[in-house]
């Protein structure tokens, strides 16, 4: 290998052209950048990047090939009060690295210094970037492009979904390969979901605190390298990209979209006491929101916050998203703590990143889902994201739980949430699909735990049960824990059925947490982010098959109801919906606000949802006509009903006319 040629300022990252590798690095405040390459024995050779165009440093290394391990040492001022923390003693990951070798360990050499720089060299323990080739044969792959109105999302963890699946080959359980295996594809099709939403798959690290406690970051919301796949779920690190793309291709052939949960709000460098392994040492002032005293704005609760209004960071974020779409063919993203994306530092719908995404022909056409809050002032922004974003709807989650798990909730409030929360999302030209309805998610109780626990039980997390929310709107039905007498277990089953029916038969985009259709429990842990064990892994051998069948039947029923699949707002008199009381008459103003939780919802003039959320068996007079219960509510003896349905306490049934 020779000295570096000047090379080009684009594309960003390390790009192999068949003859060598072009390297680029964005840093607005650096004074000098060294490329450091390592041989198989760990010997290091350094090259100054000779070119600079604007804020991008670049150089070309002839003869370099995929597999080359590299990093950067970036020279510049150490001025903490101004937000500058350059320290060339620290080897830094390329933010655009497509593969990472080594883990981010809790090691003192990885700290760049607090008030004064730590000049101890860290190359021996620092993770390394690795040059790759992106070539892959996609064959005839095509994106399913499922319309929002027909979309049913299934949120899952790569490892936890398949690690205990007895029908999968042992060697692929808990890996990318398992996602596209025929056993899993067949299950997804049988269940009826249309999109698999994966918790973070970009390379992530366990926080030093967890490492010291003997725990790991299981969920993955602590990103190291946003362009690199987490290698632990591959047969080998060099195979991660191809194995992930194989899974995407297999899922696409079955008509199933792949959505990635992506963390663009903070990095694993954490606060000023965290490790310096990339952005902090490359250009701390540009990449992060810095306070006047040089510390970080912590709007994420993770110690730092990415400055997604800085032009260089906006470009980084957009290129990251485009990489996953163009190189890995993913169909969309769920953005963690997405209010950070709109901070300028206050939240704005025309924030630079939102504008860039909307203007991008690649990104503006995939599914974009915001978790519409962060922990900073003004961070709660449900309903305020611009199109084409959809949003997690916590109003729906809380209302569904409060309606069925006895709490005070009016019929009017329930109906509003059932109708895609039009008071929140019917703005800026957005359709009902912008409301992503959920009962549960990775963060919080599972559905089974919602009906078994009144209190969180997070002792295993090592924080003396202080972590996790206390606002669960759950109901143990009279006994804390999973067990109980038969009548209690039946009441819990009925509550689960009612909640699932509410989720899957409401207007908006439903999201189902993997395992809720099995009856999976985390034994009351509502913050299992550090539990990479049987607490979070789905136990397929113990799955409640009847509940799975019930859930699949609800999804099939949903796809038959035009009022739910049309993705247009319901208007009075359009035939999509009628709201009726227990006597099949329009609900009065008093019944909307003060009446018992009894109602009927007539959809598309032929599907009737009869609801008795009271504690008493109640007769409900059906609208005129002949009605027959539909699966999963129809029994073997399924007579035509022409007058009255005897609604059991906390009961729900769906009928079809004719």
UniProtKB/Swiss-Prot annotation:
Reaction(s) catalysed by this chain's protein: Hydrolysis of (1->6)-alpha-D-glucosidic linkages to branches with degrees of polymerization of three or four glucose residues in limit dextrin
The enzyme's E.C. designation: 3.2.1.196
Residue ranges of the region described as Disordered: 459-484
CDD domains named among the record's database cross-references: AmyAc_Glg_debranch, E_set_GDE_Isoamylase_N
Domain of life: Bacteria
Major enzyme class: hydrolase
Site positions per UniProt: Transition state stabilizer: 443
Family to which this protein belongs: Belongs to the glycosyl hydrolase 13 family.
UniProt xrefs under HAMAP family: GlgX
Protein's recorded name: Glycogen debranching enzyme
Organism: Salmonella paratyphi B (strain ATCC BAA-1250 / SPB7)
Gene symbol of the encoding locus: glgX
